[in-house]
Amino acid sequence: GLQGAGGGLNIISNGGAPNATQSINIRGFTGLGSAGSPLIVIDGIQGGDINSINANDVESVSVIKDAAASAVYGSSAPYGVILIKTKQGKKGQPVAITYNNNFTFESPIGLPTMLNSLEFAKIYNQSLANGGGAPFFNQDALDRMAAFQNGTLKTETVANTTGDSYKAWGGANANNDWYKIYFKDVSMSQQHNLGVSGATDNSNYYVGLGYNKKEGMYRYGDDNYRRYNLRANLSSNLTDWLTFNFRGAFSQDKFDTPNTYNGKTGGNYMHQIGRKHPNLALYNPNGAISDESDILLLKDGGRNISTNDKPIFTGEFIAKFATNWTGTVNYTYDGSFNSSTSHVKTLYTALPSGMLREIGCTAPNGFARSFNKYQKNITNAFTNYDLNLGKHQIKL
């Protein structure tokens, strides 16, 4: 990895979601509360996306800092440069095929431990009493919590004596740790890489394929991330004075996650988990998942799906005009295409009577799609003259 590739190089993960990217900076903070990102240069092309490159395709990484970066790349690199060189075939190398894989198991850490429901209810009531308020949990609810915890009561809640509903916030008697309910104990990620390289007297090539799958931590309504990578590098001496180089890469990543139902969760399930009372039921006596748990939103609700396609390729001709004198012409296409869909699916909860009731903030049923694209075309033409005179070098 990049960590440790150079002094002062800091890499920070932006969250724990399967599609979380990484932020990179050199020398830490560059201003009050901010840290500028270094310029990424992949095979001589500026502005590559380091989060979409397959690490298995990388041959070497180097870091340029401070004045050295500005001297070469000018105002494009005020925060340093990370140079990435991808693999190529080597002259005289026979055809080589490589395959490797990696399986990773992850567990959430640092999750709060919730009080059991009876302890929570008593402390909650005491806090209200300290302020001169009435208790939120009555004695009947407290007795049922105790009975549920000692095993004499089997259901997590009971029906209200009036109306067609189950007792919830102040009346349910479950004993749930919502962090353990919402999150898996372990999630798995896997990565597979295939590389083919080779060379003849006049040409060399490298082709790399990569597949990366990351499972999320949701126990219900699994969130997941997939990325596919393709890279092809080719260099060929067409004549003794003309060389053709091609470098191309394509990546596609797809993130599929439950819709957050902003009106009900505030757009953040973590926000909801921290607010849930441990006495709330996961399952009602009729066997249906409760409305208040919000698990139905994860399990049966709509999905948010985002797909990013990123093609980039460079074609280059290098002509040797004379000893130490070359001319180069190249063209680069750099594109990014994003497609996102958001589905709000109307959900229903089962009532004690057997009737279904619409869950609040899940209607109307809706579907939205957005599409964004970015394209950049770069053409360069330049000449180089390189002359060595003893201990002196002239390069123009």
Question: What would you call each of these model-derived segments?
Answer:
Residues 71, 193-194, 314-316, 335, ...:
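Short secondary-structure capping/turn segments at boundaries of alpha-helices and beta-strands
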Residues 91-175, 212, 216-312, 328-330, ...:
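Surface-exposed loop/interface segments of Gram-negative outer-membrane beta-barrel transport/assembly proteins
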Residues 59-60, 240, 313, 323:
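Short, well-ordered coil/turn residues that connect adjacent beta-strands
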Residues 86, 198-200, 236-237, 317-319, ...:
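Residue-level signature of outer-membrane beta-barrel architecture
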Residues 39-42, 238, 312, 316:
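Solvent-exposed aromatic/hydrophobic patches embedded in short alpha-helical segments
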Residues 1-231, 243-245:
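Short, small/polar-rich motifs associated with maturation and membrane association
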Residues 7, 275-279, 323:
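Proline-centered flexible-loop/turn and helix-kink motifs
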Residues 10, 191-193, 299, 314, ...:
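Short structured motifs
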